[in-house]
């Protein structure tokens, strides 16, 4: 007779499971969580690759739904033991209205929390965003900071504002009716003069570890913030991107910016004005705006070992392997574009 401790019994729900991070979490759960009985993938748009996952020993259930619809979230969650909430609307260019961003990121998160209370699901891992911390509108640097580093978080852009509000909801809900909403994870994909990046596989791996350890270490991990980090080098946007683009034949020309900073500021102001004037007529979403310029020109790096101390996190992928995998992905994307 099999040891009951080894019988797969857990049901996981991953919201936004077809997104870039969500897909990595889904695939990694199937590979690394031996207690998994059913994996529910909840997303507004379901991907075709889900079908290939349905042939394995774990039941993979694809659920098309919208986090802004409370009844759909509750129905998907019923009977789940662990929820990993990655669903969200990332928009720093103004493609979506502030109201839509708030509805998805804030109300959607509230719906997930309410569904946890309604269904008795005790464990929630929430994916936040580094933009919640900064860079702020004043352009203050965040140099080798950790989860406890004082930093004046001032936001005006709808996206970081929405993620900050959503994170606050999760923090306030922790411990409510015995619930453990913990391990809020930041995706470290910020800013420029010197920036800290992290490979998506290591971000997914940290989610797996938090979800696995949260119940046993609830007193320590519940309601905590964890920056995700690995051994990726601190470099500017351009220099870091060239780590992956150089093998594809691209070269970075020059050692100084093509345009002076004051001119970039002027251009962002002009773009913001045009976006406001044209909004009633046409959707104008320039890549360069005041927010993206501030992000790209503010040092933002992380140096912490909190996740290792709390639940034994170590990067699953080395920098060399992360770089090789990313180059392969870029080359595959390049090939599919032709």
Curated annotation (Swiss-Prot):
**Coarse class of the protein's main subcellular location:** endoplasmic reticulum
**Which chemical reaction does it catalyze?**
7alpha-hydroxycholesterol + NAD(+) = 7alpha-hydroxycholest-4-en-3-one + NADH + H(+); 7alpha,25-dihydroxycholesterol + NAD(+) = 7alpha,25-dihydroxy-4-cholesten-3-one + NADH + H(+); (25R)-cholest-5-en-3beta,7alpha,26-triol + NAD(+) = (25R)-7alpha,26-dihydroxycholest-4-en-3-one + NADH + H(+); (24S)-7alpha-dihydroxycholesterol + NAD(+) = (24S)-7alpha,24-dihydroxycholest-4-en-3-one + NADH + H(+)
What highest taxon heads this organism's lineage?
Answer: Eukaryota
Task: Write out the residues that bind NAD(+).
Answer: 163
Bilayer-crossing regions? 258-278, 280-300
Q: What GO terms describe the biological role, i.e. biological process, of this protein? A: B cell chemotaxis; bile acid metabolic process; cholesterol catabolic process; liver regeneration; regulation of cell growth; steroid biosynthetic process
Q: Main EC class of this protein?
A: oxidoreductase
- State which pathway it belongs to: Lipid metabolism; steroid biosynthesis
Q: Which GO terms describe its molecular function?
A: cholest-5-ene-3-beta,7-alpha-diol 3-beta-dehydrogenase activity; oxidoreductase activity, acting on the CH-OH group of donors, NAD or NADP as acceptor
The family line of this record is: Belongs to the 3-beta-HSD family.
The protein, known as: 3 beta-hydroxysteroid dehydrogenase type 7
Q: Which organism is it from?
A: Rattus norvegicus (Rat)
**Coding gene?**
Hsd3b7
């Amino acid at each position: 007779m099999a040891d009951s401790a080894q019988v797969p019994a857990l049901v996981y729900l991953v919201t936004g499971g077809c997104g870039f991070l969500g897909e990595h979490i889904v695939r990694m759960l199937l590979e690394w969580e031996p207690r998994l009985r059913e994996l529910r993938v909840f997303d507004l748009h379901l991907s075709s690759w889900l079908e290939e996952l349905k042939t394995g020993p774990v039941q993979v259930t694809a659920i098309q739904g919208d986090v802004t619809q409370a009844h759909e979230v509750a129905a998907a969650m019923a009977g789940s033991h662990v929820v990993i909430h990655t669903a969200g609307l990332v928009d720093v260019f103004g493609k979506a209205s502030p109201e839509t961003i708030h509805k998805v990121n804030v109300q959607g998160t509230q719906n997930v929390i309410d569904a946890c209370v309604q269904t008795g699901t005790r464990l929630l891992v929430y994916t936040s965003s580094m933009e919640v911390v900064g860079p702020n509108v004043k352009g203050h640097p965040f140099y080798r900071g950790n989860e406890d580093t004082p930093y004046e978080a001032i936001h005006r852009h709808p996206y970081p504002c929405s993620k900050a509000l959503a994170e606050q909801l999760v923090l306030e809900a922790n411990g409510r009716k015995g619930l453990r909403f913990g391990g809020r994870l930041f995706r470290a994909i910020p800013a420029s003069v010197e920036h800290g990046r992290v490979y998506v596989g290591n971000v997914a791996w940290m989610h797996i570890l938090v979800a696995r350890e949260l119940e046993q270490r609830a007193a320590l991990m519940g309601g905590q913030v964890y920056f995700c980090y690995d051994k990726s080098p601190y470099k500017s946007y351009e220099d870091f991107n060239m780590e992956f683009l150089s093998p594809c034949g691209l070269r970075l020309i020059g050692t100084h910016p093509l345009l002076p900073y004051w001119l970039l500021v002027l251009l962002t102001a002009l773009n913001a004005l045009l976006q406001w004037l044209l909004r009633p007529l046409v959707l104008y979403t320039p890549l360069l705006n005041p927010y993206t310029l501030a992000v790209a020109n503010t040092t933002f790096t992380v140096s912490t070992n909190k996740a290792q101390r709390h639940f034994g996190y170590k990067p699953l992928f080395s920098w060399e392997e992360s770089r090789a995998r990313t180059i392969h992905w870029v080359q595959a994307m390049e090939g599919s574009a032709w």
